[in-house]
């Protein structure tokens, strides 16, 4: 989907913006709390008032800011539905904070965490520990993915982590491709039409976008029907197609 990308210049303020935490709960205070409010109140408010945007917003951080962005997930109703945390310098208590909150969160969240085997040792170790915690969460509202790279060091990691994390963040939004068809759809024991409906419902639930079912996706479901000779499903599929494309007609010769 189309996105508006906002960058914040932190050339001389990165530490005080993202790393001033209290000594007891290890949560933002003073300048870091102010920076949190600046994003939550000023930036989000400005773009909400001046642009037509959905409720699905993504925040990206690396190292100190990768830890900082996690604080947005500790609210009951996070303002960000997508978080990309690249090589986070994890603060004390953060692992337990995230594990506890994401286990019971009611909002739809897409969370992508990344590091490298050649990252700083302390960061890589802590990220791997967080990965284990988040992998164990059983919550249908959380879509969590960890990306552990092999060759990139701490400074080159963003060059591969950013595009791969974005791809993961929007993976559910993509049209059906051969990989999805071969690995999932072709092995379905339930109706492929129901799968298609559910796929687009998830897109709406996670991304707050009412996406029209693509003709490409109708074609893949039709292919399943033909391959398996479940021709009785044509009626169900045609009703859905007419609902999505009432003005469209395709003549198929076989």
Regions found by a protein language model. Give the residues of each.
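Non-catalytic cap/lid and distal C-terminal segments of serine-dependent acyl enzymes
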Residues: 1-254
């Amino acid at each position: 989907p189309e996105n508006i990308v906002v960058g914040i210049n932190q050339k001389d303020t990165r530490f005080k913006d993202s790393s001033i935490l209290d000594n007891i709960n290890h949560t933002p205070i003073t300048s870091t709390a102010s920076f949190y409010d600046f994003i939550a109140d000023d930036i989000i408010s400005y773009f909400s008032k001046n642009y037509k945007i959905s409720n699905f917003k993504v925040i990206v951080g690396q190292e100190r800011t990768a830890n900082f962005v996690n604080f947005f997930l500790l609210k009951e109703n996070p303002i960000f539905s997508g978080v990309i945390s690249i090589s986070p310098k994890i603060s004390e208590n953060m692992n337990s904070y995230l594990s506890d909150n994401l286990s019971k969160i009611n909002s739809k969240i897409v969370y992508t965490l990344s590091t490298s085997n050649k990252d700083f040792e302390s960061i890589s170790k802590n990220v791997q520990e967080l990965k284990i915690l988040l992998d164990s969460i059983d919550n249908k509202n959380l879509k969590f993915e960890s990306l552990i790279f092999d060759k990139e060091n701490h400074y080159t990691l963003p060059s591969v982590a950013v595009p791969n994390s974005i791809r993961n963040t929007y993976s559910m939004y993509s049209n059906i491709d051969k990989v999805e068809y071969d690995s999932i759809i072709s092995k379905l024991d339930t109706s492929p039409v129901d799968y298609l409906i559910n796929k687009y419902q998830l897109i709406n639930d996670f991304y707050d976008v009412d996406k029209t079912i693509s003709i490409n996706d109708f074609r893949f479901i039709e292919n399943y029907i033909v391959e398996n000779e479940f021709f009785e499903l044509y009626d169900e599929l045609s009703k859905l197609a007419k609902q999505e494309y009432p003005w469209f007609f395709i003549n198929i010769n076989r």
